[in-house]
Amino acid sequence: EVQLQQSGPELVKPGASVKISCKASGYTFTDYYMNWVKQSHGKSLEWIGDINPNNGGTSYNQKFKGKATLTVDKSSSATYMELRSLTSEDSAVYYCARGYGYDPFDVWGTGTTVTVSS
């Protein structure tokens, strides 16, 4: 069974950083790009960026450049997203999603809730 297991909820203070993980199983990890998506309450999904597990190459939505950094660890079939300089606008559920190019994302992670509050 193909699964994307994400790390648990995070409560962080404004100005801090957070790093969340997405561990893949049930398929050849390097065969698919991994995408990250933001779901804010009452808003549409926003694509943050993607990472190529083969070489760590990344592509970002301009809006999230400087906010998000994607990394990969092939040895553990995991990708990571670090969010920095957090504000209340960054409070959301973040998903990893398997996909390539313009194909629809076919497998989604469990989601990680990030709450930014003092």
Curated annotation (Swiss-Prot):
SMART domains: IG (SM00409), IGv (SM00406). PROSITE patterns: IG_LIKE. PANTHER family: IMMUNOGLOBULIN HEAVY CHAIN. InterPro entries: Ig-like_dom, Ig-like_dom_sf, Ig-like_fold, Ig_sub, Ig_V-set, IgHV. Disulfide bonds join 22-96. It comes from Mus musculus (Mouse). Residues 99-104 are annotated as: D segment. GO terms for cellular component: extracellular region; immunoglobulin complex. Residues 1-98 are annotated as: V segment. GO terms for molecular function: antigen binding. GO terms for biological process: immunoglobulin mediated immune response. Keywords: Adaptive immunity, Disulfide bond, Immunity, Immunoglobulin. Gene3D superfamilies: Immunoglobulins. This is Ig heavy chain V region AC38 205.12. Residues 105-118 are annotated as: J segment. Transmembrane segments: none annotated.
